[in-house]
């Protein structure tokens, strides 16, 4: 298997504010978290784990041959859960890179994960995250995050507002992160920052503390499920691709 020094961790907490028991919601006949895991598993990495506080989620993943790490339900963020899970991976001293894939993207493309890893290994960035070029209409129709980058693709700022102001094309931020091990360790040791709390974006903690985030372009905006409306869209998308035999 490739990239044996990389661990992929999918944080998945049963409790959800806007969609009850979100990871166990069905898309077709398969739960959301199972779909995420199966997509991620197609990247072909040995060290792929679901980090959860739930026996129900663990049961779903184990039934399809996945590996589970139990983490405390009180852990505040997905990144903190990722780090706690990393510490529990057997022989984790051999892991140099950790990819955090959100547990709410049922159609995430394995190629995006591999691209993060390649960019991370072939750069000096602390963290690498994917972005997608989108037009104003696409991004205004969502509550998602845009990012401003420099000419080398280094992230300058992330915002829930459209940035840069006045543009017609934007960079949509996909919520996945590839960390160097020492960068993940440093991140969780830092206190939440002013900009992070203002924008409600924990990646700003990285930038405010002088760490670097590189971006890699991917083709498609993945569907994220956070609300009942998002779930309906995901089900509709699944029905459409099923009709096409994809």
Curated annotation (Swiss-Prot):
UniProt superkingdom: Bacteria
GO biological process, one term: CMP-keto-3-deoxy-D-manno-octulosonic acid biosynthetic process
Catalytic activity field: 3-deoxy-alpha-D-manno-oct-2-ulosonate + CTP = CMP-3-deoxy-beta-D-manno-octulosonate + diphosphate
Cellular component per GO, a single term: cytosol
Main location: cytoplasm
Subcellular compartments: Cytoplasm
EC number: 2.7.7.38
Pfam families recorded: CTP_transf_3
Molecular function terms from GO: 3-deoxy-manno-octulosonate cytidylyltransferase activity
Gene3D superfamilies membership: Spore Coat Polysaccharide Biosynthesis Protein SpsA, Chain A
Keyword Cell inner membrane in annotation: no
InterPro entries: Cytidylyl_trans (IPR003329), KdsB (IPR004528), Nucleotide-diphossugar_trans (IPR029044)
Keywords attached to this entry: Cytoplasm, Lipopolysaccharide biosynthesis, Nucleotidyltransferase, Transferase
Top-level EC class as recorded in UniProt: transferase
UniProt entry tagged with the keyword Ion transport: no
Pathway given in the UniProt record: Nucleotide-sugar biosynthesis; CMP-3-deoxy-D-manno-octulosonate biosynthesis; CMP-3-deoxy-D-manno-octulosonate from 3-deoxy-D-manno-octulosonate and CTP: step 1/1; Bacterial outer membrane biogenesis; lipopolysaccharide biosynthesis
UniProt family annotation: Belongs to the KdsB family.
Protein function: Activates KDO (a required 8-carbon sugar) for incorporation into bacterial lipopolysaccharide in Gram-negative bacteria.
Protein name: 3-deoxy-manno-octulosonate cytidylyltransferase
Organism: Rickettsia massiliae (strain Mtu5)
Gene: kdsB
